[in-house]
Amino acid sequence: MKIYLVQHGEHLGKEMDPQQSLSKKGTTDIERLGHFLNEKKIEIARILHSSKHRAEQTAAILASSLSSSKKIEFHQGLEPLDPVSPIVDEINQQQHDIMLVGHMPFMGKLIGKLVLLNEDRSIVAFVPGTIACLERTDEGKWLINWIRRP
């Protein structure tokens, strides 16, 4: 099983847009990421995103890029400051590949918890538009398969 951890694309500042929608660069970066995922023929069972508009936009762009159009789903527990343990428990029960679209510092803590079993140890330098693919071994351990940044 694989999970794809995505930090939303670059967004506008609150002073320009109270919803902090994706910027033009952020939209372009995520469209390129979607094209990359489509070329790799990645199959994802579910795409989950936080409540923030920029995460939903990122998820929608990626969903439209994948060959088998997936519906995106809001999922509680993916906000920037949410605890990671509940989502780790949920991920470990999954049998199908999923994508989570969220924010820092949550994504950094999540990958630390999954790979190093310590959410306080950072191992990936996420920037807006980063994706990290993790794969679960037969022993139930998570390993970084690949990472792509804009």
Model-flagged regions — what are they?
Residues S21-S23, S64-S65, E90-I91, V115-E119:
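Glycine-rich, phosphate-binding/catalytic loops in enzymes
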Residues Q76-Q95:
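Short phosphate-binding loop-to-helix
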